[in-house]
């Protein structure tokens, strides 16, 4: 499963009045992680050519450790599993402790898909895989992913 891992740093534009990363900035960085996967996989060409629109339908985040101004970190983005029209992705923001050991600052799960405006539906995963020349079956969803998807369905029915 494709995974991207760019090196980043908390900048002045990322922080709030406490000089740690603003909660909303995490989501923006995760948008960049998803775009990075689309570009590196070659899917971006098809997205532009066919007028597909990336859409996030659900997300859940757990903040574990604050990220301070100028702190270096890595954003890991990977696809965990998929259904017919959506993928579930994991985003992990990791920094290093003083002893060099990795620190998990935040972790998020996101459900997303590519919407075809002409067809008025989400693009099937089989079509997306075909566009990038892959054949694959979705990995088994972990208990955490299953719980996330159940919670998303519950919220969806309440809306």
Predicted feature residues:
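Short N-terminal edge-element motif at the start of the domain
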Residues: 46-53, 69-71
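Catalytic strand-loop segment that frames the active site of acyl-thioester-processing enzymes
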Residues: 1-33, 143-159
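Short structured motifs
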Residues: 57-63, 75
